[in-house]
Every structure is written in structure tokens, then in C-alpha cells.
Amino acid sequence: MGDIYQLLKPKKGYAYTKEQIIDASLVNLPIPTGKKLKGNSRVIGDVDEETFKIIVDTIISLCSRFNLEYQEMAYTLLICLAESGFNPDAAAGTTSASGLAQYTRSTADAFKARSKSILGFEIDMSGTNVFDANIGCYGVLVAFLFNKNLALKWGFKPNDDKYWQLIYMLHHDGPGYYEDDRGKERALRFKWRKDAIDTYERVFKKNLLLLTALLKQKVETKLKLTDHEGKAIENKNYIIATVKSPDRKKPTHLSMNRNEKKEINVVFGKTNSNGESSPVHSRIGDEIITLLLP
């Protein structure tokens, strides 16, 4: 079936011409050279492989932490692919849309309240914070959760193809507008801009089920211990614990739902000469708890 990174690997888009760029656009802001996670330019998909993979991994981790199902996790990743091509410094020329989820200036300014409502804590996305990769990953997650909640509120169900299409349509056309009755009326009519429909067909409909299947695969994971100088720590005793029979619909967590009975795999060992543990096989996003012993 291939590889998650291979499926999500973005293609570099095209730069805006001078005539296309409006005053509200952030496309001409210089990218700080000292940023750890940054794009090569403001163009969609113009990001190096290391940054791309870190952003994919961060979004997966956040989706797991907030208990999303694998199909929802796949959808959240595809939002980032469609909007910015995983370039945290991407910016539109024809609007003020910027960052990983392409929030406009107004929706970025409103993000502090929205993150508090949905995630339980405030995140400031205003100004150039919209280009911060970690903040942007939260922005992608909230984009999915906010519009998912609207779709459910308006009577759409996950077993309906329109439910999945609606989530991206709402984000693409600006989620703030759709909280009122005008948005609900338009959602029920299900008439959207052609570019939004084309993107949904090309990115989401084509890849959602395949990416979901890839995320459900078991992968090999190793613990690697190093000191502050990056040197391997050998012969360190450890315990690694995972859930024995993970949920097939979503990542499994040992630290959540503690009243539920769970079978646990426990591995005892010592790190090898490379500072590595024995391999552990688990589904992507599953929680792995590690204890280091004297």
C-alpha cells in the first residue's frame, strides 16, 4: 500500500505574480532565517523533507491525544496537504490566508477563543504567529474539529459522503461565516465553489480511505536514548508498555479511560550499544509508555 509520507508528500505550487497580490496578503513578509521549522518560500508545498515529516508526525500526535478516529486523523492530515502542502510559511497572494491551515487574518485573530472552546486552552495565532509550525498544527486540528461539529449540529452523519465533503467546504470558504443560519442554509443546499469541489475530489476523495488504512498499520518503534551531547546511552534498563489488543478505529491510550480493562504488553530490557531498545510493534498513534530504571 505504500508509505504515509509518500502519499502525503506535497508538490510545490506556483508563486503569485505581482499583479495578483493584494495589500492584505502576507506573502511578501520575509521568513526569519532562525526558524527551526520553516518553509523555503511562501509557496504551497515548498518545504524540505525533514520539516514535512515533523509536521506530519506532530499532527498525528495531536489527533491521537485528542482521541480522533483514524479516518478523522487522515482527514486532518489531508486538510494540511490541501491548504499549505505542509509549508508552515505558506501564504496566499489573493487573500490574507496563511500558515498550515491557511487561516485568514480575521480567523487567526479569533483563534484564541476558538481553541479555548474546542481544546480547552488558549492559543494565540494572531500576527506572525500564524506561521509558527506548532501553532499551525493545532490550527489544522481545530479546523477539522470545528467544522466537524458544525456538520454534526446540522444533521449530517459520518456514514454520509456529504458529511465528509462538508467539513472541507466549510473550512475552505471560511468557517466563521457558517456559524449562523445563512451558513446552515447554504450547507443544506450543498452548493460550493468549483475550486473547493475540485480540491476535495483531488485530495480527499482520492486519498482518504487509503490514508486511513495506512494509519491503521502496525509499525516498528524503538526507544533511542542519548545524552545531552547526542551520544548513545548503553545498558540502560527500561520497561515499555503498550495495549495488547488496540482499537481498530482509533489509537489506544494506556493513560486514558483507566476504568476500562485492557490487556498490556510489557517489555523489559537494556539499551544496546546504539542506545536503542528492542523493537515494539504498535499502530500509528498508539500510546507507548516508557519507564527508565536505575
Regions inferred by a protein language model and the residue ranges of each:
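Conserved alpha-helical segments that form or flank metal/cofactor-binding pockets of metalloenzymes
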Residues: 83-98, 102, 106, 111-112
